[in-house]
Amino acid sequence: MAENMTIATMAQPSESPSKSGEEAPASTNPAATSAPPRPPRVPYHQIYKLPAPIRTFPLPTFYPSNPLSLFHLAVAWLRQVLLPPPAEPSVIHEGIWDPDTRSVHVKDPKSIRALWEQGFYGKGSLSRSEPNWFKRELSRRGLDGTTVSEERTASRREERRQVKWERAKAELEAIEKQKHEEAKLNSETVNAAIPEPPAAEIEPEPEVLLSSLPDHVLSATSTIPLSRAAPTNEFVPKTVAHGHVEPKPPVGPLELLALPNSYALVRGEELALSQPEPAPTEENVRKELKAPVGPIELLALPNSLVDLVALSVVSVLSEDAGVDEDESSTEDQLEASALTNDEPETSATEANDSTSSSSPPHTDGLPDSQPTQENVPATPERRKSVRFSSTVESTTFQHTDAASEVKNNNGSSDVEVFSSFVSAVEKPVILNVEPTVISQELVDKEHFQLAPEEAFFLTFGLGALRVVDPVTEAPISNEQLLIKLRANSYFPPRSVDNLSPEDPFLVQYAVYHHFRSLGWVPRHGIKFGVDWIIYQRGPVFDHSEFGIMVVPSFSDPRWSEFEHEESKKTWSWLMGVNRVLSHVLKSLVLVYVDVPPPPVFDEEMKKGGIAAALKKFTIREVMVRRFSVNRNR
């Protein structure tokens, strides 16, 4: 395969040897000595020591200056010849082809960990990359004391967000303080520029003798200024003959910023000042709400819909209660006035058993000839007949009942009824059934997904994976799997007769196989708007440094005889992708894939199979850097 590499691989940083011989100083803190020691953590370079799901047995290094190294080399070679290790790959994992998701699913936990730890293949169906949903659920339920990478990432992001918020707050406070100091300095400068009147021009006020004033003036006067008040340092604007403030040209920054932006704003202010301001009402106050942007406002929000409904109902009930209290106070006053004018009652029984035929009482100061309302008592409550039942039953509050009454039949308020209703909704309904033991066993519901390129590389390139049919459970050969993956790279899937060398799967797999062969770890880069992102060692050790965009190229002149789809990329697309990658500290690499024409590809497939056909794809990399005047001089 003809390849032109323009990307210089970065040298891996040499790991400094650990100073195991040096002992740590003894801790004098008693809390540190009493805390239980943590279990030793396995280093990452031991967990992910295999770059591929196969094992290699290299021979020891031979040093010509050391004769013993030759003996070591001979012993290792004889051991591998006489007692050869098992053929690699010794473990073949099994995956199931899923046509719905167009991926290969792996469900064996051992195979999942092996494929992830030995090359970073695939991703968890319920996770971002590493399949740790089960550990995350254990940590969330408190069944395991360990933490997962997602929780640590979330905590770091929260710390960064809090630091940014504190920094912005400090900057805003500094700006406000600077504005206040500038305004104070500006006012002092203006006041100092105003000349004070000379002392000779100030006419002294005549002295007033209190003894010379009449008595009625002394009694009406509380205090009399005996001297002229000292001039204040506050700014006093000059006035002209008409009594208006003398306008000054806006020369300072504060005056320029205070000017209106257009005549419409000036006209609007004049209209607003001319119209009387309406009195604030409760509805207007309620409408003046601000968006909760601070941490205190966010914490003040209700936690659930039940709390929100409770707050609204309580506010409505409080308003109704206030209105009813006013009405009840008026009724109490009327009842008190009626009781003072009525005759004294003999007993409560006579008052309750009185009928409508009794004569109404006469009010004082009104003649008998004045028409009065008959059969209407002074207080409606005195006309009611109260009877108690021998059986007392609790009142049932239905969900559809309106919460407009302040008092219920049992004497409880609507607020108490609604609070009991909310507590009943939040509490689980306890039925009269036998208690059953709920199993606390957590089932792992996550499976492992392999992309088509990853699955075919493990199957064809390494031979460490066997893909089976989901219906017949029969193994799928490499040729059949290639045809299936090529057909499903289109939507909807194409038939076998309509396939060509420019299939998206062939182009993408050529790039994936190319970078895997060079030792990189390519993974899908849809998150960053690119086709692939490549890691030097893996996502556990470092961040990806490059983003890959695959561009098919039809440079062979024989492509003019066949229909093919040219890539339609614009400069705006290129600048947009480059800007996105620059924000995440990645470099854009355009990978041009020279696709062979159909006759050449079909001929190589018949002669040498898949390997011979893939050799006809040529890879060319072009690094794209954003031009900067300061950096590219």
Curated annotation (Swiss-Prot):
It comes from the Eukaryota. GO terms for biological process: tRNA processing; tRNA-type intron splice site recognition and cleavage. Residues 321-334 have a biased composition (Acidic residues). Residues 1-19, 387-410 have a biased composition (Polar residues). Transmembrane segments: none annotated. The keyword Lyase applies. GO terms for molecular function: lyase activity; nucleic acid binding; tRNA-intron endonuclease activity. Residues 1-42, 320-410 are annotated as: Disordered. SUPFAM superfamilies: tRNA-intron endonuclease catalytic domain-like. Its EC number is 4.6.1.16. The active site is at 535, 543, 586. CDD domains: tRNA-intron_lyase_C. The keyword Lyase applies. Coiled coil: none annotated. Keywords: Lyase, tRNA processing. Residues 24-35, 346-364 have a biased composition (Low complexity). It is an enzyme of class 4 (lyase). GO terms for cellular component: cytoplasm; tRNA-intron endonuclease complex. It catalyses: pretRNA = a 3'-half-tRNA molecule with a 5'-OH end + a 5'-half-tRNA molecule with a 2',3'-cyclic phosphate end + an intron with a 2',3'-cyclic phosphate and a 5'-hydroxyl terminus. Belongs to the tRNA-intron endonuclease family. tRNA splicing endonuclease is a heterotetramer composed of tsp-2/sen2, tsp-1/sen15, tsp-4/sen34 and tsp-5/sen54. Interacts directly with tsp-5/sen54. Constitutes one of the two catalytic subunit of the tRNA-splicing endonuclease complex, a complex responsible for identification and cleavage of the splice sites in pre-tRNA. It cleaves pre-tRNA at the 5'- and 3'-splice sites to release the intron. The products are an intron and two tRNA half-molecules bearing 2',3'-cyclic phosphate and 5'-OH termini. There are no conserved sequences at the splice sites, but the intron is invariably located at the same site in the gene, placing the splice sites an invariant distance from the constant structural features of the tRNA body. This is Probable tRNA-splicing endonuclease subunit tsp-2. It comes from Neurospora crassa (strain ATCC 24698 / 74-OR23-1A / CBS 708.71 / DSM 1257 / FGSC 987). The gene is tsp-2.
